[in-house]
From Swiss-Prot:
Belongs to the bacterial ribosomal protein bL25 family. CTC subfamily. InterPro entries: Rbsml_bL25/Gln-tRNA_synth_N, Ribosomal_bL25/Gln-tRNA_synth, Ribosomal_bL25_b-dom, Ribosomal_bL25_C, Ribosomal_bL25_long, Ribosomal_L25_dom, Ribosomal_uL5_bac-type. This is one of the proteins that binds to the 5S RNA in the ribosome where it forms part of the central protuberance. The keyword Ribonucleoprotein applies. One of its GO terms (biological process) is translation. Keywords: Ribonucleoprotein, Ribosomal protein, RNA-binding, rRNA-binding. This is Large ribosomal subunit protein bL25. Part of the 50S ribosomal subunit; part of the 5S rRNA/L5/L18/L25 subcomplex. Contacts the 5S rRNA. Binds to the 5S rRNA independently of L5 and L18. The gene is rplY. GO terms for molecular function: 5S rRNA binding; structural constituent of ribosome. It comes from Cutibacterium acnes (strain DSM 16379 / KPA171202). It comes from the Bacteria. Residues 178-205 are annotated as: Disordered. GO terms for cellular component: cytosolic large ribosomal subunit. It holds the Pfam family Ribosomal_TL5_C.
Length: 205
């Protein structure tokens, strides 16, 4: 079961770039909450707490606005400062317990393929549908002992219970191959090339 991260929020009535700058100066993050059964709710979150919460992939958040019932939410769009890394803005999708949600989950290679080969994923992450309280942190691809030329398709992946693939099952998830090597020039050829270049240069002089 997913851990729920609790974040306190303040509802805000000021909008626009100027208001957003003032919020960030106070080490807070402007955010908007939207869902199927309510109008967008504009809130302000604590900057440090939000940064820590977003270190987790697909964190399930409980947004607690004073005087209101806490609302479960998933971050759907996170804007970060390119240079300093702090969170500039967050879009939050409100959800309900028992609901299935569409999320992107990272792929990770596990195990070692056959000696002399390497395994590579075709995607950093894939889109799946999962139970709200059981969103996988990562989907592993076991390549133990696989030989060069092996192809693993999305449909081959072992997904956790309650999780289903949203992409094309025939898309390639990972491949096993021999690493590409640079052609090595032998010393004799290299010497002949160098001598030829020297003679050509001398002739021009």
């Amino acid at each position: 079961m997913a851990d729920i991260i609790h974040l306190k929020a303040e509802q805000r009535t000021e909008f626009g770039k100027g208001a957003a700058r003032r919020i960030r100066r106070d080490d807070k993050v402007p955010a908007v909450m939207y869902g199927h059964d309510h109008d967008p709710i504009h809130v302000t979150l604590d900057g440090h707490a939000t940064l820590l919460a977003l270190r987790t992939e697909n964190p399930l958040l409980s947004i607690e606005i004073e005087g209101q019932k806490p609302m479960l939410a998933l971050p759907k769009d996170v804007q970060r400062d390119v240079l300093k890394g702090f969170v500039r803005h967050v879009d939050l999708l409100t959800v309900r317990r028992g609901e299935k949600v569409d999320v992107n989950v990272a792929l990770r290679i596990t195990g070692e393929s056959a000696p002399g080969t390497i395994a590579m994923t075709e995607f950093n992450e894939i889109e799946v549908q999962a139970d709200l309280l059981n969103i996988p942190e990562v989907i592993e691809i076991d390549v133990t002992g696989l030989e060069a030329g092996t192809t693993i398709y999305l449909g081959d992946l072992k997904l956790p219970e309650g999780t289903s693939l949203l992409g094309d099952a025939e898309d390639v998830a990972a491949t096993v191959a021999f690493p590409e090597t640079e052609p090595v020039e032998d010393e004799e050829s290299a010497g002949e090339d160098a001598q030829g270049e020297s003679e050509e240069k001398a002739a021009k002089e």
